[in-house]
């Protein structure tokens, strides 16, 4: 996210960084809650064998006096995506690689076929195209998977793999070949 959504809210670490955490005060926290938490963003869940009327009584008891407040705050639109390449040398015996790009938002109708395509490409099954091509057929990676996340106004699709350092380029070659096949061949 920090690369694909560089210089936007989606690209920021939700945990913060050491410098910002040192500067964070109670006043900052209260201001954040006031600016970001409103009644139009509240979801209430009840799980278990509790009668609906009892749940409603409890909700009314604890939330009935909460004044209605509607947020006008909108997330900043992400900047134009500029492809980038970041390499970090960590003193490990493996390469952990992540390939990502912007994708369709929750409101885009093309997200549904992309969810399906993501499952075919590198979804949770052992029979995904990437798992079969990279791991099972060639034994190049410990793990390989893809993920698609749709946000309200943007999206992210990525492919992750873990491999020996010497096999990184081979993995990339096979992954790019599978992506090309998906793009150029008709699906059965």
Enumerate the language-model features and the residues they cover.
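Charge-rich, well-structured scaffold segments of protease-associated domains
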Residues: 1-71, 77, 87, 92, ...
